[in-house]
Amino acid sequence: MESRLQWMRQAPTLWVDWSPTLGGWEAADLLSQRYPQARVLRVEPAQARQTRALARLAPPRWQFWKATPQVVAQAPAGQAQMLWSNMLLHAHPNPESLLRQWHAALAVDGYVMFSCLGPDSLQELRHLYAQNGWPPPSHSFTDMHDWGDLLVQAGFAEPVMDMERITLTYPDAPAVLADLRDLGRNLSPSRHPVCRSRAWGQGLQQAMASPDSPLLSTQAGRLKLTFEVIYGHAFKPTPRARVASKTEVPLQDLKAMLGRRPTRD
């Protein structure tokens, strides 16, 4: 996603990194290198993640003259030229609200760059759960075309969507589960209503590695998961002038307009 910024004509003077603790610091570091003169505002709505972000960003003690970068719960309205969000949108419980927050944070002609998981993600794990009659392991992910529609509804213009499929392989079932925990939560309303037992977890790992498991890779002894990664960007346009729902014309003016004869050239 960072490489796509080369097509943006104007470099931002202020950009927002939305939830960098979830999106990863590698991309944030690349952006800081690309825009060394720009100010960066990190947004972490949750207090716990604010603390983690501050700990990660704090300069070493010997660099006492450097100020700790700012981490806030909400971005100021209408100031940023770019908003960056990596792998967050699919895990948000109210994505429509989040898109409106992004729109509010951007200045006119500013743009949002985001990535998220698409509907083909975790298809092997979904098949495994279905085979065993278990509730889905994850909520359903939104299609990229629907994200484009939601961007327009939130006030954005010229949305551009793209996607790619990535297959990751793992040495064993615990490695798969550890990666899934880092990716987020299962927001499906049909998920297990209570925590599963240790015995159930062991059964899950055995099913993942069984000879008929959909997760088995062509590489001997490894497990695979497919991820559909959606990329999107859109601009915040100049606000349109509001048009009244009705217009009142005095009767005398209406009669005068109707009584005028058309002129000929």
Residue ranges and their predicted role:
Residues 96-111:
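A short glycine-rich, Lys/Arg-flanked "PGG" loop and its adjoining helix->strand segment in the class I
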Residues 86-90:
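Short catalytic micro-motifs in class I SAM-dependent methyltransferases
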